[in-house]
Amino acid sequence: MSLENKVKILSDNSVYRVTDLIHQRGVRWQRDRAEILSNPKFKDTIMFDYLMEKEKEWDYDLLKSLIEKHTKKYNYPIPEENELVVHLRMGDVVGEGDSCPGFEAINDMYKGFWDNLNPDQFNKVTFVVALHFGANDLTGQYYYSDKVKEDNFTILENIKKQTEDVGKEMNIYSSSEPDKDICYMAHARHYVKSMSELSTIVSKCMVNDSDIYVTKSYK
């Protein structure tokens, strides 16, 4: 199965942007918090529970407990004991514009991906990835396009080749429900952060005493 058939595309994920909701970031976070709390389709999500239960901002202890709760409640899959879980923040970040790193920066960042990792110490390698497009109607940014989609898959194919060159299969974990991806990452015992703030949030909510690795930052 090709990567395009494995990786979910969230072409209009304008509301459920976990980092912005938690860190009160951007021009929409207040409106989107209100939408999370008022729209029934978000009622069973981690962010709904977080916004209902939090007594302070940036409450990672609460978030961690909700991740554990939702994983058990919905029987979400979790990684194996000796599985390396890699977060790839893809989607609108590969686009053009002042607020996006762009194709060249992201592609360069993932060159030499395995240079500082020993693939032989892991039985399995899983990349958690979806193409996320924030589609901000207030700024006109972060919208889906076929060109940006193609550039994303070019980068993913490059990472796949590097992974196969070190003798590992590129397993993909990708969901149209961000909660499932977050819960999978937070249960990893070996976790590679991406350059995104979501990766940092997840790293503060790890369920286990995990080894955390960091990829190179984009320039």
Task: Tell what function each PLM region has.
Residues 2-126, 132-142:
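Secretory-pathway luminal glycosyltransferase catalytic domains
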Residues 124-215:
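Donor-binding and catalytic core of enzymes assembling or modifying cell-surface/extracellular glycoconjugates
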